[in-house]
A protein has these predicted regions:
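Histidine-/acidic- and/or cysteine-rich, low-complexity loops and terminal segments associated
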Residues: 1-32, 191, 195-196
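Hydrophobic alpha-helical transmembrane segments in multi-pass membrane proteins
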Residues: 25-196
Length: 196
């Protein structure tokens, strides 16, 4: 159920609806890198505790830099942010294979990568034409849209592979191949974005 929000005028409501719809409209193909990162978090361990710890760290981080960047407090060039986002995808996927355990270091790394993804989200938000007096509404809506998108990706992953997580072959038969593909894509994007 979507949260109920009361608006003072129609233009504010339109701003909210437009900004909240943008993450969903752009999740494929423009936001596929964020989808792959969330899948990387999922495949560390498809259990609620590891997922909750990682997604909470990621959400706090990307919300922070999204807000700071949107208000012009923090800024990095897209040519720097995009390769690093791609590298974050490759990193979490490789770590899932070589060190498949939740620990403090993993949470710190996810938080750091979340800061980068927030800068990427800010770039998408900048595409929404908003009057300045409606900007906070758009920022709130966009962030809610991102969070709904993350939940949708995790729910879809559970529906597709969650049934097999207790099988003996789950790690070798699903996690390793899928994370290998994710890591390869992330590595390829890192190189192509560096030299774009």
């Amino acid at each position: 159920m979507r949260p109920h929000v009361v608006f003072g005028n129609r233009s504010e409501a339109r701003a909210f609806a437009l900004a909240q719809r943008l993450p969903a409209d752009g999740i494929f193909p423009q936001g596929i890198d964020h989808v792959l990162f969330v899948l990387g978090l999922f495949f560390l361990a498809p259990k609620w505790r590891p997922l909750l710890s990682q997604t909470t760290a990621f959400t706090i981080a990307h919300t922070t830099t999204l807000g700071l960047s949107a208000y012009g407090i923090v800024s990095l060039p897209t040519r720097v942010v995009e390769p690093l986002i791609a590298l974050s995808i490759a990193y979490v996927a490789v770590e899932n294979i070589w060190r498949p355990r939740l620990n403090t270091a993993r949470i710190v790394v996810v938080f750091a990568f979340g800061l980068l993804h927030g800068l990427g989200f800010a770039s998408s938000l900048s595409e929404v034409p908003m009057p300045r007096d409606q900007f906070f509404t758009a920022l709130l809506a966009f962030n809610l849209g991102v969070d709904f998108g993350q939940l949708a990706v995790i729910a879809a992953a559970f529906l597709v592979v969650g049934w097999f997580r207790h099988c003996d072959w789950y790690w070798k038969g699903i996690v390793v191949p899928v994370c290998s593909v994710i890591a390869t894509i992330g590595g390829y994007w890192t190189i192509t974005r560096l030299f774009a």
